């Protein structure tokens, strides 16, 4: 059941990143408690990979990126409106967060959104097939100690994923 929830969750995140960020919040409120443990394993790996590839800055974290994506998305700043991932990231970084709104967004929603954004960035940066980051998410969730950030980053950069 947890794998089904993770798969559904990541699929929802990828769709939401591409279309409507509100879907992320809805999904996370429904399934977040069930996949919280898995998110705790996935998030640090995605964060380390995204930072190593320069997708997010050293002092940024997945949850903050997710919070920005959700709030900016509600204001019309959507990934699909940008031809380059870096331009989108600049836009959400410049977006003024509402601290009160941040308090109302669950950590699961922020984390799911941040993982989705990082995944889309990985796909663009490394010319990966669309939505391939979903498979990466499942690999990490299945065994985060084996599929750690160093191992996954090496595979991604070499193009030789087993």
Name each model-derived stretch.
Residues 48-162:
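Amphipathic, membrane-inserting segments
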């Amino acid at each position: 059941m947890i794998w089904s929830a993770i798969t559904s969750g990541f699929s929802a995140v990828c769709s939401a990143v591409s279309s409507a960020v509100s879907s992320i919040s809805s999904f996370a409120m429904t399934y977040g408690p069930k996949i919280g443990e898995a998110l705790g394993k996935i998030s640090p790996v995605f964060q380390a990979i995204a930072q190593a590839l320069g997708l997010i800055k050293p002092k940024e974290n997945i949850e903050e990126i997710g919070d920005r994506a959700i709030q900016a998305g509600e204001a019309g700043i959507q990934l699909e409106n940008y031809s380059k991932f870096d331009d989108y990231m600049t836009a959400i970084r410049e977006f003024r967060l509402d601290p009160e709104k941040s308090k109302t967004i669950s950590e699961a929603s922020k984390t799911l959104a941040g993982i989705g954004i990082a995944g889309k960035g990985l796909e663009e940066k490394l010319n990966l097939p669309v939505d391939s980051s979903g498979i990466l998410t499942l690999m990490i969730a299945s065994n985060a100690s084996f599929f750690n950030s160093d191992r996954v980053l090496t595979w991604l950069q070499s193009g030789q994923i087993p």
